[in-house]
């Protein structure tokens, strides 16, 4: 057996040793065909091929399936473990050119540009108000919900049910079933059978027991877990039994039921990162971090190259369906959008949005920054296209991704009425507290 694995390793090393040499070749021919010592030193050592490693792993798996499981380590186990360790070590050394013993130079890390329009995409926890990175938000929200149990266990358990369980259909089914239990208790307060819930009941097991937070909810609203005898059965089973205090206040059960039905998952909100800049010639220059893209920068370049080649080949043959498919692919490429709005005084208002957010969210963002938020205004894209405050259209559908510069103007008819009355709109349209934090765009 040991010889078998030695042969596998020898075969792997033989395949990676490079081209062979004939014994009849002259020294001159060997020198011509071979590489110089300096070049050989620069060439990193080649590890076993993927096919060879897979073959060795498959052989090990077949052998392990055929051999009965021993009670203790055997000599064959030791051999297999040793071979596996050696193969893994060789694979690691071949896949890690920067490891000691190799001559490869490690690739330099990508430097973050100091001129990014925003440092990244951030979120705000609705429970704590803490600003979070995307990779921090889920863990932080879970911890915040768990911490809430000490102050309001009912609300915390409801949040846990709706947030920790991702399958929305399963959550709805479980919540509706819990609501039915509570309805029966409220409608039939004298019926003792409705005040006990059998934990091994099929409906409870399939719809409720699988939901994180469901047990905490029952205990928080007054149920206690007890073991009771079951009629016509020898053993005992666990039940949730409504406590005396909860029975005396049935209106609380009705309130908790409605809270459970009306609740939504706790989600971090996107931080708009509202910023105001002085007038700048760099207003249309956007350097975005990788967070703004669904694909990595390398994947975006590759997709652009492939798309260019496809367009050149099929420019005269593309159908309407192909064009629509291409447009949909383009829309899905971006996750976020950075929008700047140039105001009448030249200042710039900047905010971060989801690429699929509606135009109404953009208009609301601008309106909340104005001194006179009751005055109607217009937003126009760089090509002069007027944007409508539409609940149906999203930013990516209007070409405002991954970044856009818009122009703000007051509604012309309203502006004429103001001037006809002998008044003029304020030169600065933004709220004073925003102007106090104005920055220089760089």
Curated annotation (Swiss-Prot):
**Alphabetical list of SMART domains matching this protein:** PUG
What is the topology of this protein in the membrane according to its UniProt annotation? Answer: Peripheral membrane protein
- Ranges for the region named VCP/p97-interacting motif (VIM) are 51-63
**What domain of life does the UniProt record list for this protein's source?**
Eukaryota
- Keyword Phosphoprotein part of the UniProt annotation: yes
Q: How does it assemble?
A: Interacts with VCP through the PUB domain (via C-terminus) and VIM motif (via N-terminus); the interaction is direct. Forms a ternary complex with CAV1 and VCP. Interacts with SYVN1. Interacts with HERPUD1. Interacts with VCPKMT. May interact with DERL1. Interacts with PLAA, VCP and YOD1; may form a complex involved in macroautophagy. Interacts with LMAN1.
Any idea what this protein is called?
UBX domain-containing protein 6
Query: What is the organism of origin for this protein?
Result: Mus musculus
């Amino acid at each position: 057996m040991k010889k078998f694995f030695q042969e596998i390793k020898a075969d792997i090393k033989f395949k990676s040793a490079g081209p062979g040499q004939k014994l009849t070749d002259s020294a001159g021919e060997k020198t011509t065909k071979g590489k110089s010592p300096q070049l050989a030193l620069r060439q990193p050592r080649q590890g076993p091929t993927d096919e060879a490693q897979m073959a060795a792993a498959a052989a090990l798996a077949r052998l392990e399936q055929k051999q009965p499981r021993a009670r203790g380590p055997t000599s064959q186990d030791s051999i297999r473990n040793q071979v596996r360790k050696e193969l893994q070590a060789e694979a690691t050394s071949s896949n890690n050119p920067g490891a000691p013993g190799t001559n490869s130079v490690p690739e330099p890390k990508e430097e973050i540009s100091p001129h990014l329009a925003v440092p990244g995409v951030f979120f705000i926890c609705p429970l704590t108000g803490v600003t979070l990175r995307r990779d921090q938000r889920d863990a932080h929200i879970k911890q915040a919900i768990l911490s809430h149990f000490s102050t309001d266990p009912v609300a915390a358990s409801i949040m846990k049910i709706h947030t920790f369980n991702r399958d929305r259909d399963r959550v709805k089914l479980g919540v509706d079933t819990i609501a039915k239990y509570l309805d029966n208790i409220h409608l039939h307060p004298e019926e003792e059978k409705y005040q006990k819930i059998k934990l091994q009941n099929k409906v409870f097991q399939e719809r409720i027991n699988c939901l994180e937070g469901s047990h905490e909810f029952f205990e928080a609203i007054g149920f206690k877990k007890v073991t009771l005898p079951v009629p016509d059965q020898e053993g005992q089973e666990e039940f949730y039994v409504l406590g005396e205090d909860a029975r005396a206040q049935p209106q609380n059960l009705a309130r908790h039921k409605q809270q459970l039905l009306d609740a939504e998952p706790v989600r971090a909100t996107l931080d708009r990162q509202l910023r105001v800049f002085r007038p700048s010639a760099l207003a249309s220059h956007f350097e975005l971090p990788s967070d703004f893209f669904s694909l990595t920068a390398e994947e975006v370049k590759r997709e652009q190259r492939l798309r260019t080649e496809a367009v050149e080949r099929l420019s005269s043959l593309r159908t309407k369906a192909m064009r629509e498919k291409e447009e949909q692919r383009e829309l899905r490429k971006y996750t976020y959008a950075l929008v700047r709005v140039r105001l009448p005084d030249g200042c710039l208002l900047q905010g971060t949005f989801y690429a699929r957010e509606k135009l109404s969210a953009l208009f609301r963002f601008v309106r909340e920054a104005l001194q006179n938020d009751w005055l109607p205004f217009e937003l126009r894209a760089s090509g002069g296209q007027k944007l409508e405050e539409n609940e149906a259209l999203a930013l990516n559908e209007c070409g405002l991704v991954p970044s856009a510069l818009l122009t703000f103007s007051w509604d012309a008819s309203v502006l004429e009425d103001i001037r006809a009355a002998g008044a003029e709109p304020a030169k600065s349209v933004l709220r004073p507290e925003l102007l106090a934090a104005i920055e220089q765009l760089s």
